Amino acid sequence: MTPVTGTALADDHRHEPIGNPRQEMITMLDPDVRRALDGTSIAHLASVLPDGAPHCVPVWVGTHGDHVVIFTGPGTRKARNLRRDPRVALSLTPADNPFQPVVVRGRVIGWLEGDAAWTIVDRLATKYTGQPYPRGDERVVAVIEPERQRVGVG
């Protein structure tokens, strides 16, 4: 899949239906969802294994425009899962309000690599640890377009 750039994502307001055409596409992150994603709570990312079983792992998460971003190594199980089947679910519980969990479902619409990826990787690492991410291993960023989002138990 061709990497997408931050500029292209921020400037592209075209959205085509994915899946059920009657399902309303979400083009903007809810402000409460954005606030939670931009906080320091660890998210849990669910993807689909080759046999159809769920795969859930903790991840650092953030926003990039109206998209959700996570990073990983290009050969990790989650990267392989998401490249094969782009459907994803994320959940997190904000530490300051554990009774308002956040759930986002969507699809990976692109991958950032190289300098574009490292800009986001460093931003997330600094948010969570106060320091840029150590160099050495390659990192890629999955860009997720939210299709459904929810705040609170329901």
How would you describe each model-predicted region?
Residues 31-33, 67, 117:
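Catalytic cores of transferase enzymes with a strong primary signal for eukaryotic protein kinases
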